[in-house]
């Protein structure tokens, strides 16, 4: 099964479970959790079911396209369901069956791995899912997002697409993975991997990046003062990515690092609180729609 078929299979599976299928969000981010489809929609009482592929940029993991297991940009298949259903583990195992992985024939383990994202003020109870000794999925019950308690709790399932494909296709080098007939990851992404690594570690302008961080931070605050959550959050994401570029370049000291993470976290908390307050003013409309559908 190639990666394109894997994605289509997961989309069909989770669509059948009532998930909205959305496209990836168009601002740089380090993980699918950072998409507003997860970060914002996990807040408040309104029900939410979504599945989407998210390209995730990790500048420090760039290896010029030379490492068989490390990528500047990898892909995650993200599922968020709120409130978390009682049979979520069963639904997940069914998704593996749809991918041709029979849980009865493989060693599938849920290894406790509680999750935290300090820069976004997020935390949750979680497990890594191991398939025959290799991590393929992260399972998390959100307890806190943007510093706010999650009521009700959302469940997040994050499939590592390249990791899972390596197992399904039995390939040791990520660049040999077949995306679709006639196209490998090498064909599609190796040039970008090389160039982004050169930029990250060699040609990026550190002074400019520090200026951009300050500009993005200022604009995020300015938009929040106007009550504009989504534009503000876009600039929080830009702050986070710019910080990651600076961090990968070694431009931020250990003591400075803590301060920069706190600055991003403070922005994320403001956005989370503003979003919650704005939805509350609207009377949490999706909650009313859910109640009406059951009448």
Swiss-Prot record:
Gene3D superfamilies given in the database record: Bira Bifunctional Protein, Domain 2, Class II aaRS and biotin synthetases, domain 2
GO BP annotation list: glycyl-tRNA aminoacylation
GO molecular-function terms, A-Z: ATP binding; catalytic activity, acting on a protein; glycine-tRNA ligase activity; transferase activity
Enzyme class: ligase
Catalytic activity: tRNA(Gly) + glycine + ATP = glycyl-tRNA(Gly) + AMP + diphosphate
Annotated InterPro entries: aa-tRNA-synth_II/BPL/LPL, Gly-tRNA-synth_heterodimer, Gly-tRNA_ligase_asu
Keywords: Aminoacyl-tRNA synthetase, ATP-binding, Cytoplasm, Ligase, Nucleotide-binding, Protein biosynthesis
Subcellular location field: Cytoplasm
GO CC terms in record: cytosol
EC number of the protein: 6.1.1.14
Subunit structure, as described in the record: Tetramer of two alpha and two beta subunits.
Family: Belongs to the class-II aminoacyl-tRNA synthetase family.
Protein name: Glycine--tRNA ligase alpha subunit
Species this chain originates from: Bacillus licheniformis (strain ATCC 14580 / DSM 13 / JCM 2505 / CCUG 7422 / NBRC 12200 / NCIMB 9375 / NCTC 10341 / NRRL NRS-1264 / Gibson 46)
């Amino acid at each position: 099964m190639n990666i394109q078929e894997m994605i289509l299979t997961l989309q069909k599976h989770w669509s059948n479970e009532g998930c909205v299928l959305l496209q990836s969000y168009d601002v740089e981010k380090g993980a699918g959790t950072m998409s507003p489809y997860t970060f914002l929609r996990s807040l408040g009482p309104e029900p939410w079911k979504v599945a989407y592929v998210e390209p995730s940029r990790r500048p420090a993991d760039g290896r010029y396209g030379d490492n068989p297991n490390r990528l500047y940009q990898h892909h995650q298949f993200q599922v968020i369901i709120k409130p978390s259903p009682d049979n979520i583990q069963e639904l997940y195992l069914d998704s593996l069956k749809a991918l041709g992985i029979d849980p009865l024939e493989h060693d599938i383990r849920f290894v406790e791995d509680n999750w935290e994202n300090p820069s976004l003020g997020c935390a949750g109870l979680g497990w890594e899912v191991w398939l025959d000794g290799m991590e393929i999925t992260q399972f998390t019950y959100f307890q806190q997002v943007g510093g706010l308690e999650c009521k009700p709790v959302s469940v997040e399932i994050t499939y590592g697409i390249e990791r899972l494909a390596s197992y399904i296709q039995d390939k040791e080098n990520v660049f040999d993975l077949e995306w679709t007939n006639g196209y490998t990851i090498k064909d599609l992404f190796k040039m970008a991997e090389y160039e982004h690594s050169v930029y990250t570690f060699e040609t990026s302008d550190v002074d400019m990046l520090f200026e951009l961080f300050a500009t993005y931070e200022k604009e995020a605050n300015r938009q929040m003062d106007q009550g504009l959550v989504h534009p503000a959050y876009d600039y929080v994401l830009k702050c986070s990515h710019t910080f990651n570029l600076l961090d990968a370049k070694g431009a931020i000291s250990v003591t400075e690092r803590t301060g920069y993470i706190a600055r991003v976290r403070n922005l994320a908390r403001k956005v989370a609180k503003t979003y919650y307050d704005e939805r509350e003013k609207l009377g949490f409309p999706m909650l009313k729609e859910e109640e009406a559908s059951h009448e």
